[in-house]
Amino acid sequence: MFGKGGLGNLMKQAQQMQKKMQKMQEEIAQLEVTGESGAGLVKVTINGAHNCRRVEIDPSLLEDDKEMLEDLVAAAFNDAARRIEETQKEKMASVSSGMQLPPGFKMPF
């Protein structure tokens, strides 16, 4: 299945990938992404650990319906969370792209 030296090479690749993944996870934790709702009237910025860093609300919304504002804040947070997830997937996919895996072998992410 692995051929001559194949398992050793696979282990070496796995160790290299593990180092790259650790570095990538550290980079992702430092990322900040902003989600928006209400055509940019509400903005929520979160980091790679999904911790909310900032909430910006256009002053014009403070005079409006409280429930609508709450919905816009939730939608902006969900947009930011979706964006950070997409960024994480893209960065992690780039780490594993160079590793030659046996047919049918899937990575856990």
UniProtKB/Swiss-Prot annotation:
It is found in: Cytoplasm, Nucleoid. Keywords: Cytoplasm, DNA-binding. It comes from the Bacteria. GO terms for cellular component: bacterial nucleoid; cytosol. Binds to DNA and alters its conformation. May be involved in regulation of gene expression, nucleoid organization and DNA protection. Homodimer. Belongs to the YbaB/EbfC family. This is Nucleoid-associated protein YbaB. It comes from Salmonella paratyphi A (strain AKU_12601). The gene is ybaB.
